[in-house]
């Protein structure tokens, strides 16, 4: 299946739209300014771009152990990091991918744990703050929080399925072929997990937050599960 990461704020806050580079500049430990890497100087969104709100940057972030944080690092911090910053890291003999993902620790980005309910409560009480979490949690709390657009696109079921939403990711299910016929029930479990009643559009996994695969990709996945073929869904 798939998941999308929402960059959310209180429903009472004005609508917002950010690019990946703007989000990277808001969160990164170091950014490029005038061709040099410096400690992040941005205190307000408008410091990054005059078109953004004249409000203090306040972002609740997931901890480094979180899968959501890992996906955010890849899809936002990695993609939003500028070519200039990457070149400067490379020239310094540092791994750009790792350095670009480092987040600031000066109070503008605050770790909020992995309790999404607590994050929603904090966003509701502070309309100027933002936080990121899975799309399903956004839907479940749509009366309290809403998503900012990312590069002009709002998170949606279809947008996550076809990856037109910029912060969408595939979710993988791994089975070791050597265990088939050795570990009791594993093949039956694989068949159940990939059945329509499980991961289909109206399956029980969709009801608890999974964004189902598009029909063509579901057919490929289901066939591979039944035939025990290795596939790579993109």
Model-derived regions, located:
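Flexible loop/hinge segments at secondary-structure junctions
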Residues: 1-234
């Amino acid at each position: 299946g798939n998941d999308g990461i929402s960059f959310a704020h209180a429903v009472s806050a004005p609508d917002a739209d950010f690019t990946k580079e703007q989000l990277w500049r808001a969160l990164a430990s170091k950014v490029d300014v005038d061709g040099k890497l410096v400690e992040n100087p941005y205190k307000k969104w408008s410091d990054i771009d005059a078109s953004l709100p004249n409000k203090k940057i306040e972002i609740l972030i997931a901890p480094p152990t979180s899968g959501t944080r890992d996906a955010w690092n890849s899809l936002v911090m990695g993609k939003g990091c500028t070519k200039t910053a990457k070149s400067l890291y490379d020239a310094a003999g540092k791994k750009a991918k790792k350095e670009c993902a480092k987040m600031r620790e000066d109070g503008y980005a605050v770790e909020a744990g992995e309790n999404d309910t607590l994050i929603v409560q904090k966003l509701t009480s502070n309309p100027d703050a933002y936080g990121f979490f899975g799309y399903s949690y956004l839907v479940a709390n749509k009366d309290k929080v809403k998503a900012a657009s990312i590069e002009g696109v709002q998170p949606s079921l279809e947008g996550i399925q076809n990856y037109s939403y910029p912060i969408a990711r595939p979710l993988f299910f791994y089975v070791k072929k050597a265990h088939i016929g050795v570990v009791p029930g594993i093949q039956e479990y694989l068949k159940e997990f990939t059945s329509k009643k499980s991961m289909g559009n109206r399956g029980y996994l969709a009801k608890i937050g999974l964004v189902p695969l598009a029909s063509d990709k579901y057919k490929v996945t289901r066939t591979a599960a039944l035939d025990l073929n290795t596939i790579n869904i993109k």
